[in-house]
């Protein structure tokens, strides 16, 4: 009868271990201005002394069971499970990795930003040729998917989270300021 107990305990212990591994815990996904990415259990705090790669482009509040999207200049959103991004307990840029290498994208493609892929996420984006588009929670369940059709020679140059009451501002290469209502 002791064999029956041990055979019942082993699967239960394995199931508990799997639940612990997949616990949905809060985390932050950090994309630096220099193209490094990491997952941290704590938010970055201002440092008295600057470090290499410490300028933050995007900070996404997420959880280990959520997905994050990385939008690239070719108009593709790359879906990544937060738990797949290398983690550090305390925010430490030295533990980050190159986001382009992590995503496996080409050298001529730039990562423009990291975004939560939730039902209330709205992303405003603009292209080199002046196309402005808002993407409202139409996130396909694929690992990578197009979010905008680009004409030959065009590319995304900027993207940011947006709401209806935001104003979109673009600065052209000849220093003109272009303003659009987000809605």
Task: Please give the residue ranges for each predicted region.
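Short, structured "edge-of-domain" segments at secondary-structure transitions
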Residues: 1-183
């Amino acid at each position: 009868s002791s064999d029956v107990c041990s055979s019942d305990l082993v699967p239960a212990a394995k199931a508990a271990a799997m639940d612990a591994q997949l616990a949905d815990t809060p985390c932050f996904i950090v994309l630096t201005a220099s193209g490094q990415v990491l997952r941290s259990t704590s938010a970055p705090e201002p440092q008295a002394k600057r470090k290499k790669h410490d300028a933050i482009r995007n900070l996404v509040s997420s959880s280990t069971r959520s997905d994050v999207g990385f939008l690239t200049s070719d108009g593709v959103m790359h879906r990544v499970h937060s738990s797949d991004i290398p983690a550090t307990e305390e925010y430490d840029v030295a533990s980050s990795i190159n986001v382009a290498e992590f995503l496996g994208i080409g050298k001529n493609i730039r990562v423009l930003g990291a975004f939560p892929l939730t039902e209330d996420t709205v992303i405003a984006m603009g292209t080199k040729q002046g196309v402005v588009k808002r993407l409202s929670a139409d996130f396909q369940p694929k690992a990578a998917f197009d979010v905008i059709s680009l004409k030959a020679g065009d590319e995304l140059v900027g993207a940011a989270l947006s709401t209806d009451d935001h104003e979109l501002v673009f600065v052209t290469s000849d220093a003109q300021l272009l303003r659009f209502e987000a809605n």
